From Swiss-Prot:
<dbReference type="GO" id="GO:0002218">
    <property type="term" value="P:activation of innate immune response"/>
</dbReference>
<feature type="cross-link" description="Glycyl lysine isopeptide (Lys-Gly) (interchain with G-Cter in SUMO2)">
    <location>
        <position position="104"/>
    </location>
</feature>
<feature type="region of interest" description="Disordered">
    <location>
        <begin position="448"/>
        <end position="476"/>
    </location>
</feature>
<keyword id="KW-0010">Activator</keyword>
<feature type="cross-link" description="Glycyl lysine isopeptide (Lys-Gly) (interchain with G-Cter in SUMO2)">
    <location>
        <position position="472"/>
    </location>
</feature>
<dbReference type="GO" id="GO:0045892">
    <property type="term" value="P:negative regulation of DNA-templated transcription"/>
</dbReference>
<keyword id="KW-0832">Ubl conjugation</keyword>
<feature type="region of interest" description="DBHS">
    <location>
        <begin position="60"/>
        <end position="379"/>
    </location>
</feature>
<feature type="cross-link" description="Glycyl lysine isopeptide (Lys-Gly) (interchain with G-Cter in SUMO2); alternate">
    <location>
        <position position="203"/>
    </location>
</feature>
<dbReference type="GO" id="GO:0005694">
    <property type="term" value="C:chromosome"/>
</dbReference>
<dbReference type="GO" id="GO:0007623">
    <property type="term" value="P:circadian rhythm"/>
</dbReference>
<dbReference type="GO" id="GO:0042752">
    <property type="term" value="P:regulation of circadian rhythm"/>
</dbReference>
<dbReference type="GO" id="GO:0006281">
    <property type="term" value="P:DNA repair"/>
</dbReference>
<keyword id="KW-0677">Repeat</keyword>
<feature type="modified residue" description="Phosphothreonine">
    <location>
        <position position="455"/>
    </location>
</feature>
<comment type="subunit">
    <text>Monomer and component of the SFPQ-NONO complex, which is probably a heterotetramer of two 52 kDa (NONO) and two 100 kDa (SFPQ) subunits. NONO is a component of spliceosome and U5.4/6 snRNP complexes. Interacts with CPNE4 (via VWFA domain). Forms heterodimers with PSPC1; this involves formation of a coiled coil domain by helices from both proteins. Part of complex consisting of SFPQ, NONO and MATR3. Part of a complex consisting of SFPQ, NONO and NR5A1. Part of a complex consisting of SFPQ, NONO and TOP1. Interacts with SPI1 and SPIB. Interacts with RNF43. Interacts with PER1 and PER2.</text>
</comment>
<dbReference type="GO" id="GO:0071456">
    <property type="term" value="P:cellular response to hypoxia"/>
</dbReference>
């Protein structure tokens, strides 16, 4: 009985749904007719001047210089447009002429077989204006489709530290290649969300950054949390999916049988809708629990990191202190070695000085000794001279005595006396005696005996060989 009521209720609800579906189809057909009428209208004329565009109704003048922001880079991937539904016979020159109103085009590419192309304008603002004005414009029986081209060299950066700005993000990723744009995503209050976008000028730089950051740990600040890099999801949040682009197949018509509505309580739709809501709620709760677990794990890791950082700093300070102590010890050893070397050098210098002084003293003594020996060799000393004079005196006395006993040799008259010492010698016949000296008393005694016949000397002197008193020393 209850099932019949449910069936009747669904049957009653199905009747107005079909009526609403019929009105929806009629509204859709009216929209298609209006679009066809707009396509049949001639396109607005495109001025040849690329610096300004004037409207017949409003008379607007566009200065292209005003659409460039200060410091904005030109001809980037963000100003690249995709143009679809192109005629198969369109040329590159016609493509440039179509967009010359919006400034000089930097890049033009046409794929005639597939009927699409790409064009790059100077700035993002000019590309947006061209997109709005040329989208859905009829050209040779086809309706142009203008969209922003997908940026294949853009990356999403996660786990950004709190104090990372756009400039720092661009500077950090510029090591991989030329960066066209780097943005740190913030919330409605301007607080960083920990995510960012980096757009490179080419795919090789983006691939290099993706590989390097995946293999290693890329740090942007002192906080040792590495960033994660992944390809950016190309999502169109501006145009979305218009009705005219939806594929009208059998599944489309089946889904569009029911209009937007609230499920009636107690119905089949309501029962399974509630089950779907329970599943979504469970997913949300589990996601919240996962987020809480991750948050707790992050806080715990940050606390451990701070403790480890403090310990690491203490260890570094200890190592630095030990290094400085070792350096001081090494410097002290070097100083001691230098002092020892200096002392040894001073000792060697002192020893060398003493040796030189000793050598000089020896040389002086040797020189004096040689001088004395040379003086003695030339002039005999007083003692030797006395001995020699004594011997000469004794020999002279003996000669005089002998001459007194012998007759004188006859000398012829007129013969001069012989020169030399013999002429100076005293003659016994004349009764002359040589003068006596105190030192040669023996010779005087002998001379007196021989010449005068025993006259005593001036003072009694013992003969040679006589013994002296005990306290007297013998003189030679």
């Amino acid at each position: 009985m209850q099932s019949n009521k449910t069936f009747n209720l669904e049957k009653q609800n199905h009747t107005p749904r079909k009526h609403h579906q019929h009105h929806h189809q009629q509204h859709h057909q009216q929209q298609q007719q209006q679009q066809q009428q707009q396509q049949q209208q001639p396109p607005p004329p495109i001025p040849a001047n690329g610096q300004q565009a004037s409207s017949q109704n409003e008379g607007l003048t566009i200065d292209l210089k005003n659409f460039r922001k200060p410091g904005e880079k030109t001809f980037t991937q963000r100003s690249r447009l995709f143009v679809g539904n192109l005629p198969p016979d369109i040329t590159e020159e016609e493509m440039r002429k179509l967009f010359e109103k919006y400034g000089k085009a930097g890049e033009v590419f046409i794929h005639k077989d597939k009927g699409f192309g790409f064009i790059r304008l100077e700035t993002r603002t000019l590309a947006e204006i061209a997109k709005v004005e040329l989208d859905n414009m009829p050209l040779r029986g086809k309706q142009l489709r203008v969209r922003f081209a997908c940026h294949s060299a853009s990356l999403t950066v996660r786990n950004l530290p709190q104090y990372v700005s756009n400039e720092l993000l661009e500077e950090a990723f510029s090591v991989f290649g030329q960066v066209e744009r780097a943005v740190v995503i913030v919330d409605d209050r301007g607080r960083p969300s920990g995510k960012g976008i980096v757009e490179f000028s080419g795919k090789p730089a983006a691939r290099k950054a993706l590989d390097r950051c995946s293999e290693g740990s890329f740090l942007l600040t002192t906080f040792p949390r590495p960033v994660t890099v992944e390809p950016m999801d190309q999502l169109d949040d501006e145009e979305g999916l218009p009705e005219k682009l939806v594929i009208k197949n059998q599944q489309f018509h089946k889904e569009r049988e029911q209009p937007p509505r609230f499920a009636q309580p107690g119905s089949f739709e309501y029962e399974y809708a509630m089950r779907w809501k329970a599943l979504i709620e469970m997913e949300k709760q589990q996601q919240d629990q996962v987020d809480r677990n991750i948050k707790e794990a992050r806080e715990k890791l940050e606390m451990e990191m701070e403790a480890a950082r403090h310990e690491h700093q203490v260890m570094l300070m200890r190592q630095d202190l030990m290094r400085r102590q070792e350096e001081l010890r090494r410097m002290e050893e070097l100083h001691n070695q230098e002092v020892q070397k200096r002392k040894q050098l001073e000792l060697r210098q002192e020893e060398e000085r003493r040796r030189r002084e000793e050598e000089m003293r020896r040389q002086q003594e040797e020189m004096m000794r040689r001088q004395q020996e040379g003086f003695k060799g030339t002039f005999p000393d007083a003692r030797e001279q006395e001995i020699r004079m004594g011997q000469m005196a004794m020999g002279g006395a003996m000669g005089i005595n002998n001459r007194g006993a012998m007759p004188p040799a006859p000398v012829p008259p007129g013969t001069p006396a012989p020169p030399g010492p013999a002429a100076m010698m005293p003659d016994g016949t004349l009764g002359l005696t040589p003068p006596t000296t105190e030192r040669f008393g023996q010779a005087a005694t002998m001379e007196g005996i021989g010449a005068i016949g025993g006259t005593p000397p001036a003072f009694n002197r013992p003969a040679p060989g006589a013994e002296f008193a005990p306290n007297k020393r013998r003189r030679y």
